[in-house]
A protein has these predicted regions:
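Conserved "HGTGT" condensation-loop signature of ketosynthase/thiolase-family condensing enzymes
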Residues: 1-73, 97
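Conserved beta-strand segments that form the floor/walls of ligand-binding pockets within enzyme
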Residues: 4, 76, 106
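Short, surface-exposed acidic/glycine-rich loop or hinge patches that mediate macromolecular interfaces
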Residues: 48, 80-83
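Short glycine-rich or small-residue beta-strand-to-loop segments that form or flank ligand, phosphate
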Residues: 74-80
């Protein structure tokens, strides 16, 4: 059995921090950041949480896919920045989208998290354990990053998909 992507959704916070904004708080420049990373701007949370962003992305994916949330059997949320230890953020997404029959868990694997979660979902489907799995990647790294460290703060933003 092979899995397929039935729908996608994303959420990015409204607040945008461009490289010029970042240069006001750490010694850097737009040119320096772009040369090293190609990044020109990043989305930053204000009131949102990781689970909120994941839930909004999930709602959009469900809408696009046409799948009844009650058909979802498992939700895997790849995140390194959940705001709570429990319930896991995947359980918050389950509640948000109405996936009343789904199990859910968070997977923390940093930058490779979404790929690992996707491969895990594929393995569950191939093994015949689940048929309908939702995979989400979501992080709010702006809460964790050291905004005085020019080498790392330029890399991270917030969002979900």
């Amino acid at each position: 059995m092979v899995g397929k992507i039935c729908g996608t959704g994303s959420y990015a916070p409204h607040r945008v921090m461009d490289n010029h904004d970042l240069a006001k708080i750490v010694e850097t420049s737009d040119e320096w950041i772009r040369e090293r990373t190609g990044i020109g701007k990043r989305h930053i949370i204000e009131e949102e949480t990781t689970s909120y962003m994941a839930g909004q992305a999930a709602l959009r994916a469900v809408e696009q896919s046409g799948i009844d949330p009650a058909e979802i059997e498992l939700i895997i949320l790849a995140t390194s920045s959940s705001e709570t230890v429990f319930p896991c953020a995947a359980c918050e997404v389950q509640k948000t989208i109405g996936a009343v029959h789904a199990a859910g868990y968070d997977m923390n694997a940093a930058c490779t998290g979404f790929v690992l979660a996707f491969n895990t979902a594929q393995a569950y489907i191939s093994a015949g354990i689940y048929q309908t799995v939702m995979v989400i990647g979501a992080d709010s790294m702006s809460n964790l990053v050291d905004w005085t460290d020019r080498g790392t703060c330029i890399l991270f933003g917030d969002g979900a998909g």
